[in-house]
Curated annotation (Swiss-Prot):
The name this protein goes by in its record: UPF0261 protein CTC_01794
Segment forming the signal sequence: none
Highest taxon of source: Bacteria
Source species: Clostridium tetani (strain Massachusetts / E88)
Sequence similarity: Belongs to the UPF0261 family.
CDD domains referenced in this protein's UniProt entry, alphabetically: Tm-1-like
UniProt cross-references to InterPro entries, sorted A to Z: Tobamovirus_resist_UPF0261 (IPR051353), UPF0261 (IPR008322), UPF0261_C (IPR056778), UPF0261_N (IPR044122)
Cysteine pairs bridged by disulfides in the record: none
Amino acid sequence: MNKKIIILGTLDTKGEEFKFIKDIIEKEGLETIVIDVGVVGEAKLRPNIDKKEVAIVGGSSIEDLIKKKDRGYAMEVMMKGSAAIVKRLSKEEGISGIISLGGSGGTSIASYAMRALEVGIPKVMVSTLASGDTRPYVGEKDITMIYSVVDISGINTLSSKILSNAAYALIGMVKGKAPELKGEKPLIGATMFGVTTKGVNIAKEYLENNGYEVLVFHATGAGGRAMEDLIRSGYIKGVLDMTTTEWCDEVVGGVLNAGPNRLEAASDMGIPQVVAPGALDMVNFGPIETVPEEFKKRNLYKHNATVTLMRTTKEENIEIGKVIGEKLNRAKKDTALFIPLKGVSAIDAEGEVFYGYEEDKALFNTLKETVNKDKVQIVEMNNNINDEEFAIAMAKKLINMMEK
């Protein structure tokens, strides 16, 4: 059976460019399914799924969208419709990849549809916006974004090279052999930051030596969301959540938040989770000159040229502790909270720049007061989070939960 590639985009404004990509893909022996998400103009390339069908699936009609003249509403309808169709095609047809190109509108619609596909299916997005902040488009999925350099307006010497590269990149991904994500060993999701790396690596090695495969997610916002998504997809069977720092950014206003649903998936799916307040001593910002004026006089630490850390206060830790405690109370089964009494990160240790006994005490007390002990086991240890004893204790607890 031929591998099928979805080509999705606004065929009224970018028909020539999509045909260029389509011809390359089909020349390499792959089948294409073209989806039109344009609204106003006539498609310049015949689609397999036209814009009328996309609009209907999205809850409206093309006629209604044109009549309303509301670009935002039209975008929302076409995003919903295209995502639903892409998801259905993946389930029914066994889609092998997806590619698109566009400006702000096309990128928003196509990337939304791409995020409906599971991790591992190749996704390539050629965009005029790919050199800026791509977080709204990539989200927690493995979307490859390629900067178009020039506006996507016809085929010329430069655009033909860029579009060819994009098409052949997708072809290579689709034709290449990759191992299946689901392996024989049970998958465990773990969260890590630079300041919790030592502890996480110790726990990871212990888990792997005991027959588990560990996927480590960098707790940068996108990492936390990616782990939550894979938990809900059913891939991950247990969670070693040693680094819950994304809640600092969510509560205080840093740049690496994972959104308000972090720490929900494991409870909702009913899988074992062992959690620690890793790196809850810090809020993340970009280069030091980008730190908001209101925080300029706080305890700041230049982690590197592009990352500035800000020490959390007692008041912030109380608020963070309440939120995390409430999230853990969603647990249906097998949940433990490990508290490292000698610090939650490498720089929250005695003599280090973020060491704060009172701040940590406020955090720990709030967690203990908020957590429902009938649902969540609390384990306090006289260690720093990176100590071997602490890390192995967390790993052992998770194994016990998963094997009982």
